[in-house]
Amino acid sequence: KGSKVEQLMIDADELEWERASATTLTRLSSTPEREDLAYVMYTSGSTGEPKGAMITHKGLLNYIHWATSYYKSNKGLGAPVHGSIAFDATITSLLTPLLSGTSVHLMTTEGIGIESLHQLLAERKKYGKKSWSMLKLTPSHLDLLSATLANEDKKGVCNCLILGGEALSYSSILPWREYAPKTRIVNEYGPTETVVGCAV
């Protein structure tokens, strides 16, 4: 009482249980076809009218297969997943490590900010100082991370730094070139319609 939540009352005597249980059910196929939808991602409209981009299993698996090999996601700890699943760049951090046998570190909704990511990266000593397989960020997030992460903590924090979602300037990667020279830096481009990335 007093709340604005609607209630639904079901009287068990009114349900037709015998008739419902006698219905023949058709089992749906649990194996998707290549052209079946894997997900729909809504674009920002930067390449045209805002719309939902329909991503097929074929396109998704093609990208993930390529990414697991190119980013060598089986080397290291896996990847922190710090972005929203509504952002297609998260697909790389989430699925690529899992499909190559490494792990993902899911950040809580309270811990999605750059401060929490900084803390996780700075605390890698508890993982035996092993490197993350990959870290995917926008260049703006990289600039924020670079400003807060100590230079000595940049070294070995990840094997591959993947940047995308906006224009990348050389000044953004300069601290990483200087303090983490063994970290591979990749500028990935791709409109949502092409399944995350189509050019590096």
Regions found by a protein language model. Name each.
Residues 12, 17-200:
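Motif- and composition-driven signal specific to adenylation
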Residues 1-16:
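Structural core segment of the AMP-binding/adenylate-forming
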